[in-house]
């Protein structure tokens, strides 16, 4: 496994997770 692709995958996971947390906070959950 390439370290660059692994870093990109981790970045996308963190980004989508934080984005969903922001959406949850805005909707009042």
From Swiss-Prot:
It is found in: Plastid, Chloroplast thylakoid membrane. The keyword Iron-sulfur does not apply. The keyword Chloroplast applies. Disulfide bonds: none annotated. SUPFAM superfamilies: PetN subunit of the cytochrome b6f complex (SSF103451). Its main location: plastid. InterPro entries: Cytochr_b6-f_cplx_su8_sf, Cytochrome_b6-f_cplx_su8. It is a single-pass membrane protein. Component of the cytochrome b6-f complex, which mediates electron transfer between photosystem II (PSII) and photosystem I (PSI), cyclic electron flow around PSI, and state transitions. Belongs to the PetN family. This is Cytochrome b6-f complex subunit 8. It comes from Glycine max. The lineage of its organism: Eukaryota, Viridiplantae, Streptophyta, Embryophyta, Tracheophyta. The gene is petN.
């Amino acid at each position: 496994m390439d370290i660059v692709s692994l870093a990109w995958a981790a970045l996308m996971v963190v980004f989508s997770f934080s984005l969903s947390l922001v959406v949850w906070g805005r909707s009042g959950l």
